[in-house]
């Protein structure tokens, strides 16, 4: 059968011509009842949703075949629009972790407002993004009341633990090795100073703020400590975020006596057969040298605002940070000076302002099926060299202290862009999802003779930051290649690009555990100068992996990848690589 005429009856809100455009079925088309049902009620931009978004909850549309003539059908679309319904009561059930106002402030469905299906779906998304409730079991129950022309909405939630603990301990050549990290995602700073009747447990909670405390040690050779605080609704009235953090770390070197001892032990081992570690003579722990060290400390303060334009998925944030590096006979930073030496003693300061424009419209923080994420940022230091009136091409050529003073205050401008998109291939909760990724970064300078040795890109491998790799570099993952292999020492990255795609499939989506498998292809590269940036000159890889999310631990997983290209003049391909993943990457 073919469609001949479509007549609309009872419509006053939308014109018949406009409704025909939205129906997308014109005269002469094959009469497709499935397509018609999707355009009337099923699709996101279905005609019914236009009515629901304007509060017409009691709207009804009945398509009637009024005439069948041969192979042609005439349709009459009979609409009962009904009155607009306002929201009467909004109830929240199942919340036993947060203060109720913390949940209510995220809702777009508030008493007195006109009912809107779009607002209902957006409220669902905002609750899921909070991370305190199982996103797979958020159930809005809409109860229309035709008598009063209102609707009640019951939000049925399932609370889940969202705090994270990371603990590891052991013994190695450097002595005691350990790490402890505590992340409290439902902290309440107000209750810390003014205890209320709702004070819960040993730690004040209920306001949805995040407090993170961590410490790490590798015996006497490395120690680091950090603390951070984040409030997504600073002041409690508007979605303006506030953050503050501080850190300190120290790493020391190994005494030259260790290498002499190691040489002698190997000598005796050769002639007398004693093991290299016989009696513990080769342990680093015995050769700690406090006169060779690098200390780092810093702090940051940030503020963010949810925007209304272009839409309210956008946020704008600013962060002011300060870092200080104290070098004491430290020969591993590879800062080459004008006098030909490498900087080993001195102080470096990094004062910068970071501005970020971001947008996140994903539907689920753990296993996104739809939506996108992107961020564009610029990090700037003051252009000290423009005001100093110094010729840095020859500055300090004959004097170490003068040459090292070039880096007392580091200067640079750093530009980054990151994006991800998510597309569900089928409907339902257990559906395959394609994730695509594109990102790049550039580290520029104000003076070509005063390029920053810090804030470079450390590319390759699993993307996890380690204390022994790069002190002030940003770690960029590229699976299929060893950690940092694309930017070895002496070839630091001042520009990078990374592209990729993943096919994900959920194996388990429960409150306590979420597991999904993935297959991926990706490519990327890093360059020692911005002028060498070439997004078509990529190192390629492909592989498979699995991710597991546990509430007390967070996201972790393992990937196997194969690198198809050679790197840094190597005669062999990168080949097979395993990568262990801890944490959720943007």
Which ranges hold each PLM region?
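Phosphate-interacting basic helix/loop segments used at nucleotide- and nucleic-acid interfaces
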Residues: 42-62, 136, 223, 299, ...
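Gram-negative/organellar outer-membrane beta-barrel architecture
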Residues: 97, 116-367, 373, 479-480, ...
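Interaction-mediating elements
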Residues: 1-130, 134-135, 141-153, 157, ...
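C-terminal beta-signal and terminal closure region of outer-membrane beta-barrel proteins
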Residues: 464-470, 531-586
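Active/binding-pocket-proximal capping segment
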Residues: 100, 124, 172-175, 246-247, ...
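Short acidic, glycine/proline-rich loop/turn micro-motifs
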Residues: 104, 256-257, 388-390, 529-532
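C-terminal outer-membrane beta-barrel translocator/porin domains of Gram-negative envelope proteins
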Residues: 147-149, 163-172, 328-507, 512, ...
């Amino acid at each position: 059968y073919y469609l001949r005429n479509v007549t609309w009856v009872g419509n006053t809100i939308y014109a018949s011509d406009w409704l025909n455009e939205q129906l997308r079925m014109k005269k002469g088309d094959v009469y497709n009842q499935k397509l018609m049902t999707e355009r009337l009620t099923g699709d996101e931009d279905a005609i019914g949703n236009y009515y629901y978004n304007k509060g017409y909850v009691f709207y009804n549309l009945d398509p009637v075949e009024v005439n069948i003539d041969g192979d042609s059908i005439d349709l009459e679309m009979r609409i009962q629009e009904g009155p607009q319904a306002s929201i009467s009561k909004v109830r929240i059930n199942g919340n036993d972790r947060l203060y109720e106002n913390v949940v209510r402030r995220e809702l777009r469905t508030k008493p007195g407002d006109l009912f809107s299906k779009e607002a209902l779906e957006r409220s669902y998304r905002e609750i899921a993004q909070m991370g305190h409730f199982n996103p797979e079991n958020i159930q809005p129950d809409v109860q229309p009341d035709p008598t009063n022309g209102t609707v009640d909405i019951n939000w049925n939630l399932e609370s889940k633990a969202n705090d994270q603990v990371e603990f590891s301990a052991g013994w190695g050549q450097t002595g005691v090795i350990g790490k402890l990290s505590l992340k409290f995602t439902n902290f309440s700073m107000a209750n810390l100073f003014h205890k209320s009747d709702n004070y819960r447990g040993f730690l004040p909670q209920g306001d949805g703020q995040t407090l993170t405390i961590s410490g790490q040690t590798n015996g006497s050779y490395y120690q680091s400590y950090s603390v951070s605080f984040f409030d997504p609704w600073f002041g409690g009235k508007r979605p303006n975020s506030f953050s503050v953090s501080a850190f300190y770390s120290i790493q020391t070197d190994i005494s030259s006596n260790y290498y002499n001892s190691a040489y002698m032990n190997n000598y005796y081992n050769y002639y007398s057969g004693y093991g290299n570690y016989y009696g513990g003579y080769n342990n680093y722990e015995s050769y700690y040298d406090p006169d060779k060290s690098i200390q780092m400390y810093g702090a940051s303060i940030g503020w963010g605002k949810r925007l209304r334009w272009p839409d309210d998925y956008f946020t704008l944030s600013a962060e002011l940070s300060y870092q200080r590096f104290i070098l004491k006979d430290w020969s591993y930073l590879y800062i080459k000076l004008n006098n030909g030496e490498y900087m080993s003693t001195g102080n470096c300061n990094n004062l910068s302002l970071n501005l970020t424009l971001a947008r996140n419209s994903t539907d689920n923080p753990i296993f996104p099926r739809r939506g996108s994420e992107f961020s564009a940022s610029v990090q700037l230091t003051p252009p000290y060299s423009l005001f100093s009136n110094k010729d840095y091409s020859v500055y300090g050529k004959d004097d170490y202290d003068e040459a090292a003073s070039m880096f007392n205050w580091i200067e640079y401008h750093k530009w980054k862009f990151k994006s991800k998109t998510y597309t569900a291939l089928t409907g339902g909760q257990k559906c395959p999802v394609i994730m695509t990724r594109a990102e790049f970064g550039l580290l520029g300078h104000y003076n070509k003779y005063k390029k920053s040795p810090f804030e470079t890109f450390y590319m390759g491998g699993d993307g996890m930051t380690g204390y022994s790799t790069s002190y002030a570099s940003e770690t960029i993952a590229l699976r299929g290649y060893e950690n940092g292999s694309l930017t070895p020492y002496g070839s630091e990255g001042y520009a990078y690009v990374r592209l990729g795609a993943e096919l994900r499939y959920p194996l388990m989506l429960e409150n306590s555990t979420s597991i999904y498998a993935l297959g991926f292809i990706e490519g990327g590269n890093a360059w020692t100068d911005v002028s060498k940036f070439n997004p078509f000159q990529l190192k390629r890889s492909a592989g498979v992996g699995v991710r597991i999310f546990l509430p007390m631990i967070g996201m972790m997983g393992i990937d196997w990848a194969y690198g198809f290209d050679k790197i840094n003049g190597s005669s062999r391909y990168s080949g097979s690589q395993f990568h262990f993943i801890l944490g959720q990457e943007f």
